């Protein structure tokens, strides 16, 4: 038992929320970048809510360790109409014994999904930090004003500008849901420039193919598109997440497999409401 607890501590410390949230949000990100940062929204509407259960695995034992919920509602930003999207991830009592996880992400985008603002407040273990991004688009470029509040209270400011569109973990989720996955080819790689308050990731998606997924503990089955999220670091490519999204116009993630040094983690869709389109990927 002591050995299992030690291993579990290693896993939970390794499993930063960055991986969990990246997995949850990247599960819909199969879009290419372009100078046009907006896109017509056909995938979701105000009042959509998605719910997930989170699991860790060690020694072939799966344990539920938390939940995640995401909501999108109509709002205003700087006096203009916008979508307000939030993601809340919470560890349960089992996880709290080893690693506290309390995280909230907030995003504002225009009605055509152009990113305006992003904030992440993360309590991971004993460390709390905040990331903020403000977007503007001078002369057709994408300008980022970046702010990090470190766990020791230090404020770090930075500004960056790119010719291509840059996204955060929330806005890429919303944009990607509106792309036509039928145009993708098996094995195709799609660059994914995603920024936080400090770094721009060198990452991409690989389209794996189609599979049918049966939800654990139920009779629900979904036709899914399968993708891998890959990041290049220290000269090597690392598959961080493999995910399954509904093969319909909603493009909702129903399963995520996250690969860790000391084990693995999974997220499963628990429920949903307020979706815009019929869930035609669901098999009876």
Label each PLM-derived region with a short phrase.
Residues 19-29:
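Sec-dependent N-terminal signal peptides
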Residues 26, 32, 195-198:
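N-terminal non-cleavable signal-anchor helices
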Residues 31-37:
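Boundary at the C-terminal end of the N-terminal hydrophobic targeting segment
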Residues 129-196:
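A charged, solvent-exposed segment within the mature domains of Sec-exported extracytoplasmic proteins
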């Amino acid at each position: 038992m002591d050995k299992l607890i030690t291993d579990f501590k290693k896993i939970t410390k390794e499993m930063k929320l960055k991986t969990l949230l990246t997995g949850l949000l990247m599960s819909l990100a199969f879009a290419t970048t372009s100078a046009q940062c907006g896109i017509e929204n056909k995938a979701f509407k105000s009042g959509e809510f998605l719910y997930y259960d989170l699991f860790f695995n060690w020694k072939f034992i799966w344990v539920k360790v938390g939940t995640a919920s995401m909501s999108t509602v109509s709002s205003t930003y700087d006096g203009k109409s916008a979508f307000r999207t939030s993601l809340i991830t919470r560890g349960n009592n089992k996880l709290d014994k080893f690693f506290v996880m309390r995280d909230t992400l907030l995003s504002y985008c225009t009605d055509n999904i152009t990113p305006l603002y992003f904030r992440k407040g993360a309590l991971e273990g004993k460390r709390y930090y905040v990331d903020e991004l403000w977007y503007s688009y001078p002369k057709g470029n994408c300008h980022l004003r970046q702010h990090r509040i470190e766990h020791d209270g230090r404020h770090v400011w930075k500004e960056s500008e790119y010719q291509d569109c840059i996204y955060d973990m929330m806005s890429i989720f919303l944009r990607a849901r509106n792309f036509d996955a039928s145009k993708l080819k098996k094995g195709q790689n799609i660059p994914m420039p995603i920024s936080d308050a400090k770094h721009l990731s060198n990452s991409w998606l690989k389209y794996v193919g189609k599979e049918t997924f049966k939800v654990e503990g139920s009779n629900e089955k979904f036709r899914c598109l399968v993708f891998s999220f890959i990041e290049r670091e220290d000269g090597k490519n690392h598959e961080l997440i493999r995910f399954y999204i509904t093969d319909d116009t909603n493009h909702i993630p129903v399963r995520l497999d996250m690969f860790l040094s000391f084990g693995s983690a999974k997220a499963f869709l628990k429920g949903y409401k307020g979706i815009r389109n019929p869930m035609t990927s669901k098999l009876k």
